[in-house]
Amino acid sequence: GVERGLEFHSLSKSFNMTGWRLGWVCGSAEWIARLARVKSFVDTGPYLALQHAGAAVLDAAEPYLERNVAHLEARRDAAVAAFRAVGFDLRPPRAALYLWLRIPTGEAAREFALRVLEEQAVVLLPGSALGEGGEGYVRAALTLPADRYEEAASRVARAL
């Protein structure tokens, strides 16, 4: 491992810092030096204050992660219950921030997602946008407060 590869990590999802472009990389000193050289030609890194914020988050990571996981699990459980209540058969994700909903009408994923957006003002990603295996599914992001999923699921169901 460490002699032949690099391992990348991000603060984006675990610490709700999407868009900050903060993370770290693990590997041998030789490979880290090579990466630093390439990075020096590409960009100068995130704003220093953001880097300090990221370091502060890592210093207090454990209690924050426990609260964040509980929050995300509640959001996931609310979304799964809401979509199941309107007839979707789905498995709860173990770690992802998304639900995969099989389109029961057989409609193409892109057309269904566009129709739900236009008719019900709910944004779903067509599974086909992520590859052939995604056709027949839409992806719902678990980014809403837990109390909003019942309404979102009802709107999607009205589009069926």
Predicted segments — roles?
Residues 1-160:
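PLP-dependent class I/II
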